Amino acid sequence: RVICTNMLNGALDKASCHIRLRHTKSIKEKLELGAQVLKVACSHALDAQELYRHLTTIKMSDEDVYKYLCELQLTPAEIERINQYDPNKGYARLVARDYRLLEAVEISSRKANQLYNMMDYYNDGIGQKDICGTAWGAYNAVTGFYCNVANLEGEKRMNSLVWGSANNNMNKALNAVVAYAS
């Protein structure tokens, strides 16, 4: 219970979840705009929830996951070289970091390590036990890699996740898994 302004200011300074509103001339319009933004966000959240639930029903074999991850991380030329070198097991060998394959098809160890870490997250990541073998599990491995495994820290990490390459790769991963599910 707030008794005085000092107590209110002290409580607000220590609070972790609060919104301050200044009563300016445009407060009414800003509140209405905020309500519209919240409605759009809630609608988007419901649509996303429905999509993610659908992805949990789509089965993906390990070979499909290898191909999915490789198609996200590699260039078309690299994919073509893998398919020419070993059309049957190329993706699996790449994800397992077969160094002879890496050298033969000229793929950097950085990309191979990313693929290996994504597959490792797919098999053993947080919460993956129940969704392994599904399209949702494959997509979650990509997002989990960028959010939990990638080596960026601090502001660089946040910028990458929100606006940068990690965000672009996660959007690309979502589009690819939705295309697979269709």
Where is each model-derived feature located?
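Intrinsically disordered, low-complexity regions enriched in serine/threonine
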Residues: 2-182
